[in-house]
């Protein structure tokens, strides 16, 4: 039995294989030579992700920093939202002393505080506050989620910097606290 040869089909197949090979080589060159979005804490870098469980005043839930970011944000966009991250420890004396001021700033920039006419006191973009509660290397100190809750809510019988968390400065906070007891987030942001 004689084999049938179709030279047109053979030429088309060879051409298709060559075009596909060039396409894949081009994709590989692009992948190797293109820089990804730089991640870090420097100017122009994308912030490292914050991960973990977060306490919002009622329950611990999964925290996703991406939900706070605007993907198509541009400089000067008055409608864009900002994200302010505070790394703190519930037993750090400075953190306890500045808790009142931090809460006031959060209420103002998150547009919770209102003017007499009911409009937000802050006229700029919304600034979302997030506290990443870590455990610093303070001798004789161990933190817990109960202590984080008591610090945020200004309640409970937990101790913050050797006194009751309920006695710290300011009112209860209205922003999210992330459990970073293991310091993973803090290390990413150094």
Predicted segments, located by residue:
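A short beta-strand-turn-helix
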Residues: 51-83, 111
């Amino acid at each position: 039995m004689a084999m049938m040869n179709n030279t047109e089909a053979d030429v088309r197949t060879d051409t298709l294989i060559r075009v596909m090979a060039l396409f894949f080589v081009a994709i590989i060159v692009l992948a190797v030579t293109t820089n990804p979005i730089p991640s870090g804490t420097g100017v122009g870098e994308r912030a490292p992700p914050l991960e973990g469980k977060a306490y919002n005043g009622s329950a611990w839930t999964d925290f996703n920093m991406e939900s706070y970011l605007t993907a198509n944000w541009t400089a000067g966009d008055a409608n864009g939202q900002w994200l302010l991250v505070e790394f703190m420890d519930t037993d750090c004396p400075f953190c306890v002393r500045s808790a009142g001021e931090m809460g006031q700033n959060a209420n103002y920039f998150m547009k919770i505080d209102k003017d007499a006419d009911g409009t937000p006191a802050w006229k700029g973009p919304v600034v979302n506050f997030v506290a990443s509660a870590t455990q610093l290397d303070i001798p004789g100190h161990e933190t817990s989620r109960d202590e984080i809750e008591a610090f945020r809510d200004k309640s409970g019988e937990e101790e913050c910097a050797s006194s009751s968390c309920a006695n710290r400065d300011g009112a209860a906070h209205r922003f999210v606290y992330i459990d970073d007891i293991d310091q993973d987030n803090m290390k990413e942001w150094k």
